[in-house]
Design a protein with these regions (language model features):
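Pocket-flanking alpha-helical
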Residues: 16-57, 75, 83, 130-135, ...
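Structural signal for conserved beta-strand scaffold positions within catalytic alpha/beta enzyme cores
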Residues: 19, 64-67, 96, 126, ...
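Residue-level detector of flexible, active-site-proximal loop/helix-junction positions
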Residues: 22-24, 69, 101, 131, ...
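A structural signal for short loop-to-beta-strand junctions that line the ligand-binding cleft
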Residues: 56-68
Length: 189
């Protein structure tokens, strides 16, 4: 992996890979000055650099080395839930991603831009993508947010599950409000 390549090709560097909760946790580690490189999403990186949102009052002096791949926001449900649009999340059980992850950050932004309140309008769970898929299959949640590349195997596997009809909830109407508040970080495909 990347740690092995860095250790092999960067003189004097001994890199190790560390499992974290995602972009926010990675950026918090960068802020300690101990790791030199981390994988993060652009919106979480900008928040860290500006010292806003989860980094309020604690800006992190980060620099971007490379963009590896574009991430896509998935708002995933199944037809049995009755969720057809973002407003239908009201009163539902929704996973907004692992706590402290960039999925959670972006989910909160999409929810707000769609005119919903993450604390009052839904019952929230904080699950990773695999846990969210299992919870949706078991009908413990009604929908989940996930930010990742295409294809994401957990979402693909959900769609291939017998008896499950996958529903991707359109959230493109939230884009203008997100760009207005956070800048041109978000685009429609």
């Amino acid at each position: 992996g990347m740690a092995a390549a860095l250790s092999k090709y960067v003189p004097g560097m001994q890199a190790t890979a560390e499992v974290t909760g995602g972009s926010v946790a990675n950026l918090q580690l960068i802020g300690t000055g101990k790791p030199y490189i981390a994988l993060t999403m652009a919106d979480a990186t900008l928040d860290a650099y500006k010292g806003q949102d989860k980094f309020t009052g604690k800006p992190v002096p980060v620099r971007t080395l490379a963009v590896l791949y574009p991430n896509r926001m998935h708002v995933v449900s199944i037809t049995a839930s009755g969720i057809k649009k973002m407003a239908d999340l009201k009163g539902k059980r929704v996973s907004t991603g692992s706590g402290g992850s960039a999925t959670e950050v972006m989910a909160f932004r999409v929810i707000e831009a769609a005119g919903l309140d993450k604390d009052r309008d839904m019952t929230r769970e904080r699950l990773g993508v695999a846990e969210s898929v299992n919870a949706l299959k078991d009908r413990k949640i009604d929908a989940f947010f996930w930010v990742g590349g295409l294809p994401t195997s957990a979402v693909t596997d959900l769609g291939a599950t017998p008896g499950i009809k996958l529903k991707l909830v359109d959230h493109s109407d939230a884009l203008d409000a997100m760009v207005k508040k956070y800048g041109p970080l978000y685009v429609k495909d």
